[in-house]
Amino acid sequence: IFGEWKTSNNFIFGIXALVIIMVGVIXTXYTEKGDGFTQKTTNKDILFLVLTTXGYLAYXAXPKTITADAESMFLPQTLGILLGSVIYLAFSGNKAAFKEKASYLDLFAGISFGIAAYAYIIXAQVNGVTNAFIYGQLSVIISTIGGMTLLGERKQGKELVATLAGLCLIVVGAIL
């Protein structure tokens, strides 16, 4: 799409790497059935998924579609993310979130995301959108291991094997 893969070998290895990474990410989210948690997917959920996917595609492709430096793109993208969040809250019916203390404490996570987003924009300009996406997916490794060690998320048996296999696949895909 962005002309980053010049040869057929680049294309084959690139597609394979993306597929391997996606399979790895899916494997890290594996949970065994019977944990007592079920959730019905509604049309509203699917609509939000489609809209957020379209927003993410626009966000991820913006560094290659315009000829501006990372600093000048950062504020418009940040405002777009903020607007998207406000629209999501307005349509989800959770207007009380604007008054909750927890929402404002989440600003720290937002600042962390902002730093990561800025790094992504720079990486996309320097390395290309595809490579920046792949490098960004390596954060799944950090968050998964951090969740298991720092936050005490428990994974045993098949879940642990699937998670570790998924992390290995992400690394293999990133190396490709």
Curated annotation (Swiss-Prot):
Protein name: Putative sugar uptake protein
Transmembrane stretches, start-end: 10-29, 46-63, 73-92, 104-123, 133-152
GO cellular component, one term: plasma membrane
Annotated coiled-coil segments of the chain: none
Keywords: Cell membrane, Membrane, Sugar transport, Transmembrane, Transmembrane helix, Transport
Record membrane topology: Multi-pass membrane protein
Originating organism: Lactobacillus delbrueckii subsp. lactis
Major localisation: membrane
Keyword Cell membrane belongs to the record: yes
Compartment(s) of residence: Cell membrane
Family: Belongs to the GRP transporter (TC 2.A.7.5) family.
InterPro entries, per the entry: Sugar_transport
Molecular function per GO: carbohydrate transmembrane transporter activity
